[in-house]
């Protein structure tokens, strides 16, 4: 119970629990967070710009009112009171056993009534011990001291950091009352080795001058860095060793937290920007918290921030941003799956129509919002208790600031950061679209078709009319631009108008840590024993000898620098003086115009700030980067869609198998699942007897009006008014050669009508009309088909489409995930046989696949005049230099094609080069051809082979669409090996055979039989059957079944179980381009979860499809070999496809039911009296 009060990052990972009912607070707070985030997600750019402007305004306010106020003194304080602020007071006497004891400043008067009060001053002369230094520190005797002061030189004190700073130190003690006079006298100390030189202010010498007396001018970067380093060393000198170690570890932990943030965001799909935006959100929250804290009068110092911020970052971290990001990205993936399911009728259309950004963010906040808010509340309460604790030393102030920072971080998480996530999701959507379109174009698909296919992916299909951005119509972009500009002007006008009325003293008093860094409140007190331990020992010895209690005020070390007085005190030169006078006059001129003049003066003063000017440059750079980021999105993703969401449920798998089992076509009682609602499609024919009418060409209506004259028709054609013509007029023009048959789609713009016209033209063509006259009214369907994807991509001179029955085999467990295997075939028993093999494989734990190769090939042929030149070209291509040049040339043609290797062969003066490349998720023949052409061009023009003649881009050395030993040996496309281990009892019960019989059959048939036939790659039972069926169903190239079906099936008896494997070295598949862009084939790829390009690793989808095909071939091989071993093959085919098998009896035996043909042969109820003895014996096996 107590662990609930801890933030999530401290509770550790817990086992996922079942969903619980939301609490009362969750029900009321979560909708508020959802409403706020909904506004931010609806207008993400507006939200980001508004927050950035407010943060900039807060920064400018801090500058104007605190750090760069014009009313602050321009000369550093070199007076006694400023020096005493960081001092420490010590007392030694008989009551302290003559040991130094620290006392508070407010008790000095009481403690020093009976004691000598001394001041201990240390003068620091930097870099005077360095070997490279040309200056030397003044000796103690050369320090100008008034004669009326009682000054006692003391031994200086060295510490561990003195060696790094190379400083010289002089220490003095004197009565405390004489301190101000001594300080005034030592503001300048002459340098003993200084030489008088001529400067723009006359002749002068360099002098040791107190740095505190220097005028605050704009320093260079080198000066700023030098001052910062000096102040850093001062802090180290005054800090305890343990404190230094703790701070060092704190800063290391803080930077490790930053690294952890970027690594976590990288896992979520963002290499850089989400991590940077998370840091920006935290910085903006810190600025808001800082300005509120200072407005409320709470003093905050830079030293306090430098000590506390690392531990705040480590303690709070960025876990909430990471949790929200993970939830949003996961729900975005879930939404895309719902869209795909809704297309196939599996999902809810209402949910799929919801904007993906709104859905993802709202669902994530509903799931994680209350948990995040609770963590914020707990952390803020803890910090509030720290602020109210009364603990001194800066803890109160820092806790107050941290609480406000967390409050604003909470606000920005649900506004600014959710807007950033909306932009990220929109960019992911654009990226998927662009990647798919470019991959299709690389594969040879026209840009128009590629654009249409890419838009069909994901939530692009839901956009009607205008294109959308962030779920809003693009027509709102001009309105957004106007509102953004007006809002920006309004905010800046408010900021400008408030400048004259701001009170520079409204914040706490400010002290500087370094001359260019702003701080608040008093500096850190010195450590007296690190600064002057030797001097304190000398004073203590003198006090003990005099038996006189002593009070010592150890003051902050006084730093000097060797400089010309004119530069130190910023005396203007002739040129600089003019510029200064001009600047003063310029500002004074504006001051004379009252409030308006003070506005302009305030603006100019703000722009002079180096930090603000750099921020403006950074903001502009980020704006440019964001625009580039929107239009040049990189490869990102969240998680692999091929990874199963849950482990295999054996009960669910058994029910699925029983539904698709040949032995039972119904679900068990009590397992009926009502159909999910399906989206109503327009013009969907009813499932009635007239359903086939939609697949037939309706009888052409006779035109009421006769055809217009040919001259009028030709005039309409010239005026591009073809759409106004009737079908008969178009047929007439086409048959007279006025409209080419191949150009009907382009001319008409109506693809279905163009197909209809072409059918009429072919049917009436006199040369073939005796054969083709029936085409016009044939049963070849052509309507209700998306011809836009076909035109320019898949087929020409289209007259219709050929429906093929598609069945599913399975489910089949492949590498731990279940699949239903789509198979388009007209061969009966094939799907049922594969399903039986799937059932047996599942009983053995599923199939395991290994991808052995991935590389499509293209083998051009080039020729040379002489064998010598051909041999030189071969040697060059085989060399490392030649390979590098060809790879660079080839890879430059595509974002996805990457040349792996080249294999060369010489035949006379002909040189054959086999390019082997990866092609992403496309099968890639067109992609490779383009790369090969360019690589050969570079070889000819830039590599010194200008006498090379390109005979053919494809020289049959690929080898494509032909049986070849090269593909069998060297591989082509994907190389896959699939394996399954089937227990012996499963072989007997499901496959109706035994292990030894199957092993013997495989050796005799698949190995010896194929070898006797001289087969190349055909050491299998019927791999081509499965490959061809899946190829047709998923839009692969059917001609490549020739080499894709290369397969060797191996069976072994493994301790009583059947070990079966198939090795397929040349499986040529793709999930992008070609026939995969057609909607039915895309739907089957969706069924397998591999449609299109993989979101994170191009090529993973096509590799997954190859694994699925390999495992499916394994199932087909197992089932067919079992049927052959059991003698069921002919009987099953006869019962599925033809009449019953003939018998010797005059009365035929009853037909075995289809559902029993493959699985329940031994339990047939028909009489066996009419069967032969051999048949009866086989049936008992």
From Swiss-Prot:
Print the keywords alphabetically: Endoplasmic reticulum, Lipid biosynthesis, Lipid metabolism, Membrane, NADP, Oxidoreductase, Steroid biosynthesis, Steroid metabolism, Sterol biosynthesis, Sterol metabolism, Transmembrane, Transmembrane helix
User: Got a GO cellular component term for this one?
Assistant: endoplasmic reticulum membrane
Its main localization is endoplasmic reticulum
Annotated region (Disordered) at 664-687, 1136-1181
Task: List the Gene3D superfamilies.
Answer: 3-hydroxy-3-methylglutaryl-coenzyme A Reductase, Chain A, domain 2 (3.90.770.10), HMGR, N-terminal domain (1.10.3270.10), Hydroxymethylglutaryl-CoA reductase, class I/II, NAD/NADP-binding domain (3.30.70.420)
| Induction comment | Expression is regulated by the Zn(2)-C6 fungal-type transcription factor FgSR which binds directly to the promoter.
TM segments? Answer: 244-264, 272-292, 298-318, 376-396, 400-420, 480-500
Q: Name one GO molecular function term.
A: hydroxymethylglutaryl-CoA reductase (NADPH) activity
Q: What class of enzyme is it?
A: oxidoreductase
What's an example Gene Ontology biological process for this entry?
coenzyme A metabolic process
Q: Where in the cell is it found?
A: Endoplasmic reticulum membrane
Instruction: List the biased-composition ranges (Low complexity).
Output: 1165-1175
Pfam families, per database record: HMG-CoA_red (PF00368), HPIH (PF13323), Sterol-sensing (PF12349)
Q: Where is the composition biased (Polar residues)?
A: 1137-1149
Membrane-related topology note: Multi-pass membrane protein
Q: What this chain does, per the record?
A: 3-hydroxy-3-methylglutaryl-coenzyme A reductase; part of the first module of ergosterol biosynthesis pathway that includes the early steps of the pathway, conserved across all eukaryotes, and which results in the formation of mevalonate from acetyl-coenzyme A (acetyl-CoA). HMG1 catalyzes the reduction of hydroxymethylglutaryl-CoA (HMG-CoA) to mevalonate. The first module starts with the action of the cytosolic acetyl-CoA acetyltransferase ERG10B that catalyzes the formation of acetoacetyl-CoA.
Annotated family: Belongs to the HMG-CoA reductase family.
List, alphabetically, the PANTHER family matched.
3-HYDROXY-3-METHYLGLUTARYL-COENZYME A REDUCTASE (PTHR10572:SF24)
Q: What is the name of the protein in this document? A: 3-hydroxy-3-methylglutaryl-coenzyme A reductase 1
């Amino acid at each position: 119970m107590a662990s609930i009060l801890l933030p999530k990052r401290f509770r550790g990972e817990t086992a996922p629990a079942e969903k619980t009912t939301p609490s009362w607070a969750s029900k009321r707070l979560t909708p508020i967070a959802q409403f706020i985030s909904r506004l931010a997600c609806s207008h993400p750019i507006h939200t980001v710009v508004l927050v950035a402007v407010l943060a900039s305004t807060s920064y400018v306010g801090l500058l104007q009112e605190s750090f760069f106020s014009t009313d602050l003194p321009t000369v550093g304080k070199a007076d006694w009171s400023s020096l005493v602020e960081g001092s420490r007071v010590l007392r030694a006497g008989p009551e302290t056993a003559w040991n130094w004891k620290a006392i508070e400043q407010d008790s000095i008067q009481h403690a020093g009534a009976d004691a000598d009060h001394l001041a201990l001053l240390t003068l620091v002369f930097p870099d005077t011990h360095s070997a490279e230094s040309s200056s030397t520190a003044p000796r103690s005797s050369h320090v100008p001291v008034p004669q009326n002061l009682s000054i006692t030189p003391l031994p200086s004190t060295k510490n561990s950091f003195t060696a790094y700073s190379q400083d010289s130190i002089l220490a003095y003690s004197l009565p405390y009352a004489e301190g101000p006079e001594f300080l005034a006298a030592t503001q300048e100390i002459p340098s003993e080795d200084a030489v008088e030189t001529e400067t723009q202010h006359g002749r002068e010498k360099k002098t040791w001058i107190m740095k505190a007396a220097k005028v605050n001018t704009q320093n260079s970067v080198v000066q700023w860095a030098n001052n910062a380093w000096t102040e850093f060393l001062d802090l180290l000198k005054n800090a305890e060793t343990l404190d230094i170690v703790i701070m060092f570890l704190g800063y290391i932990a803080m930077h490790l937290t930053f690294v952890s943030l970027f690594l976590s965001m990288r896992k979520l799909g963002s290499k850089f920007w989400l991590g940077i935006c998370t840091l920006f959100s935290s910085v903006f929250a810190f600025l808001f918290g800082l300005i509120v804290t200072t407005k409320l009068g709470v003093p905050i110092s830079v030293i306090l921030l430098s000590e506390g911020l690392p531990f705040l970052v480590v303690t709070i971290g960025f876990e909430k941003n990471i949790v929200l990001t993970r939830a949003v990205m996961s729900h975005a993936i879930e939404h895309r799956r719902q869209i795909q399911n809704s297309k196939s009728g599996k999902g809810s259309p209402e949910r799929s129509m919801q904007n993906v950004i709104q859905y993802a963010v709202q669902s994530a906040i509903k799931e994680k919002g209350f948990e995040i808010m609770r963590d914020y509340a707990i952390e803020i309460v803890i910090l509030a208790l720290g602020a109210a604790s009364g603990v001194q030393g800066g803890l109160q102030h820092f806790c107050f600031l941290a609480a406000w920072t967390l409050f604003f971080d909470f606000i920005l998480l649900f506004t600014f950061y959710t807007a950033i996530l909306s932009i990220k999701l929109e960019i992911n959507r654009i990226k998927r679209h662009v990647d798919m379109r470019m991959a299709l174009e690389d594969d040879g698909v026209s840009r128009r078709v590629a654009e249409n296919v890419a838009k069909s992916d994901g939530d692009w299909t839901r956009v009607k009319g205008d294109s959308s951005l962030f779920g809003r119509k693009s027509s709102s972009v001009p309105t957004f631009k106007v509102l953004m500009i007006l809002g920006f002007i309004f905010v800046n006008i408010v900021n400008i108008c408030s400048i004259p009325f701001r009170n520079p003293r409204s914040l706490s008093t400010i002290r500087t840590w370094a001359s260019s860094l702003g701080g608040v409140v008093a500096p850190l007190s010195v450590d007296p024993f690190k600064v002057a331990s030797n001097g304190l020992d000398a004073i203590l010895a003198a006090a003990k000898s005099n038996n006189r209690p002593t009070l010592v005020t150890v003051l902050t070390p006084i730093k000097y620098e060797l400089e010309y007085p004119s530069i130190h005190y910023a005396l203007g030169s002739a040129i600089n003086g003019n510029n200064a006078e001009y600047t003063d006059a310029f500002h004074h001129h504006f001051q004379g115009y009252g409030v308006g003049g003070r506005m302009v003066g305030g603006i100019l003063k703000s722009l002079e700030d180096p930090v603000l000017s750099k921020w403006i440059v950074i903001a502009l750079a980020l704006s440019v980067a964001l625009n580039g980021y929107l239009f040049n999105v990189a490869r990102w993703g969240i998680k692999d869609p091929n990874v199963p969401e849950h482990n295999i449920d054996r009960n669910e798998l058994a029910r699925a198998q029983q539904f698709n089992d040949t032995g039972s076509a119904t679900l068990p009682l009590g397992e009926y699942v009502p159909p999910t609602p399906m989206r109503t499609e327009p013009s969907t024919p009813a499932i009635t007897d007239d359903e086939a009418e939609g697949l037939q060409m309706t009888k052409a209506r006779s035109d009421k009006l006769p055809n217009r004259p040919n001259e009028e028709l030709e005039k309409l054609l010239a005026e591009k008014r073809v759409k106004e013509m009737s079908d008969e007029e178009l047929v007439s023009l086409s048959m007279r050669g006025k409209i080419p048959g191949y150009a009907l789609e382009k001319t008409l713009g109506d693809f279905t009508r163009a197909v209809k016209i072409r059918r009429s033209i072919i049917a009436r063509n006199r040369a073939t009309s005796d054969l083709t006259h029936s085409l016009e009214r044939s049963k070849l369907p052509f309507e209700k088909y998306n011809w836009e994807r076909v035109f320019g991509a898949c087929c020409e001179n289209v007259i219709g489409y050929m429906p093929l029955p598609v069945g599913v085999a399975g489910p089949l467990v492949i590498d731990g995930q279940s699949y239903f295997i789509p198979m388009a075939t007209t061969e009966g028993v094939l799907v049922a046989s594969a399903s039986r093999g799937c059932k047996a494989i599942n009983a053995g734990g599923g199939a395991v696949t290994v991808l052995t190769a991935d590389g499509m090939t293209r083998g051009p042929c080039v020729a040379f005049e002489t064998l010598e030149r051909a041999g030189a070209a071969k040697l060059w291509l085989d060399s490392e230099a030649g390979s590098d040049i060809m790879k660079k040339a080839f890879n430059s043609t595509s974002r996805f094609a990457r040349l792996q290797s080249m294999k060369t062969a010489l035949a006379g003066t002909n040189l054959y080069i086999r390019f082997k490349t990866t092609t992403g998720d496309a099968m890639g023949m067109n992609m490779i051809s383009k790369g090969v052409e360019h690589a050969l061009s570079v070889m000819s023009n830039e590599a010194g082979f200008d006498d090379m003649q390109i005979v053919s881009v494809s020289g049959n050395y690929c080898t494509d669409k032909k049986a070849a030993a090269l593909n069998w040996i060297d591989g082509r496309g994907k190389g896959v090996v699939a394996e399954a281990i089937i227990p012996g009892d499963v072989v007997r019960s499901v496959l109706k055979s035994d292990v030894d019989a199957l092993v013997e059959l495989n050796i005799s048939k698949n190995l010896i039989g194929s070898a006797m036939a001289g087969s190349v790659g055909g050491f299998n039972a019927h791999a081509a059957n499965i490959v061809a069926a899946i190829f047709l169903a998923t839009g692969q190239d059917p001609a490549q079944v020739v080499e894709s079906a290369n397969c060797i099936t191996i069976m072994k008896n493994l301790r009583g179980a059947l070990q079966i494997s198939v090795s397929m070295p040349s499986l040529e598949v793709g999930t992008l381009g070609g026939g995969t862009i057609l909607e039915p084939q895309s739907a089957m790829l969706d069924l397998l979860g591999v449609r299109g390009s993989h979101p994170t690793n191009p090529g993973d989808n096509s590799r997954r499809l190859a694994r699925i095909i390999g495992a499916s071939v394994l199932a087909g091989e197992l089932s067919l070999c079992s049927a052959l071993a059991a003698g069921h093959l002919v009987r099953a085919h006869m019962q599925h496809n033809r009449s019953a098998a003939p018998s010797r009896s005059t009365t035929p035996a009853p037909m075995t039911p289809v559902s029993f043909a493959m699985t329940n042969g031994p339990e047939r109820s028909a009489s066996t009296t009419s069967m032969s003895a051999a048949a009866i014996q086989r049936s008992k096996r």
